[in-house]
């Protein structure tokens, strides 16, 4: 099985969990996309993708529409995408992606969480080559789909891997090919269920159950922060 497939299996256990945390994070992504490219999803590919991902997490239509409207409000602060790299106990490494309207606050909060749990922030770029950045798409397997034919049709758009599990097709490519692969799927009238940019560790490590629990606690605290969007690790 390919790495995108393995990533998806692991992501079934993702910790975002509570809707009270999840929907505001998704709302930020929608608002930023609408603010940058306009409020019409048909004319704004990034917004279209953000809405698809929100719907995949069962975010109510009213919440999605409210997030789009916030983009045109004069009271809505500009959002900034920032990332942090960190090392934690047991050889764990973190790539922390955030979206914030106050970078000073976010830096302080993330650093405080890391320090309290025996982890430390690293210089930007320290882990850049420890993670591959991939675009991952999911869509339903239809009766008339032939995966081998589909693979051949999508190679020119940058396709690297294609897998299927339980009626869901997972495809991946280098993050730079996100737009071309997304467009190819849309041109083929394939309805995308999810589309995300992910960071995959080039050399994943294995931990004991107790070590895993230690790292999970740190990740939970990081993801409790309203500005933290995703935490990627090098844990297998």
Swiss-Prot record:
Position of the signal peptide: none
Annotated localization: Cytoplasm
Pfam families: TACO1_YebC_N, Transcrip_reg
SUPFAM superfamilies with a match to the protein in the record: YebC-like
GO CC entries: cytosol
Keywords: Cytoplasm, DNA-binding, Transcription, Transcription regulation
BP GO annotations: regulation of DNA-templated transcription
Gene Ontology MF, one: DNA binding
NCBIfam families per the UniProt record, alphabetical: PRK12378.1, YebC/PmpR family DNA-binding transcriptional regulator
HAMAP family reported for this sequence: Transcrip_reg_TACO1
Family membership: Belongs to the TACO1 family.
Protein name: Probable transcriptional regulatory protein Suden_1389
Species of the source: Sulfurimonas denitrificans (strain ATCC 33889 / DSM 1251)
Classification lineage: Bacteria, Pseudomonadati, Campylobacterota, Epsilonproteobacteria, Campylobacterales
């Amino acid at each position: 099985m390919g790495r995108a497939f393995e990533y998806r299996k692991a992501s079934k256990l993702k910790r975002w969990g509570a809707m009270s945390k999840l929907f505001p994070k998704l709302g930020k992504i929608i608002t930023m996309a609408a603010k940058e490219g306009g409020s019409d999803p048909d004319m704004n590919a990034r917004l279209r993708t953000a809405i698809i991902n929100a719907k995949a997490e069962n975010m109510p239509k009213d919440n999605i529409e409210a997030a789009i409207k916030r983009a045109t409000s004069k009271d809505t602060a500009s959002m900034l995408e920032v990332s942090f790299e960190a090392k934690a106990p047991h050889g764990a490494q973190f790539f922390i992606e955030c979206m914030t309207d106050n970078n000073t606050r976010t830096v302080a909060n993330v650093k405080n969480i890391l320090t309290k749990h025996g982890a430390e922030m690293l210089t930007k770029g320290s882990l850049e080559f420890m993670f591959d950045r991939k675009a991952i798409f999911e869509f339903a397997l239809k009766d008339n789909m032939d995966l081998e034919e589909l693979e051949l049709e999508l190679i020119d758009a940058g396709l690297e891997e294609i897998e299927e599990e339980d009626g869901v097709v997972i495809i991946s490519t280098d993050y730079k090919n996100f737009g071309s692969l997304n467009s190819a799927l849309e041109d083929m009238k394939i309805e995308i269920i999810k589309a995300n940019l992910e960071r995959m560790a080039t050399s994943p490590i294995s931990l004991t159950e107790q070590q895993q629990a230690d790292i999970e606690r740190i990740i939970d605290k990081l993801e409790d922060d309203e500005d933290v969007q995703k935490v990627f690790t090098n844990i297998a």
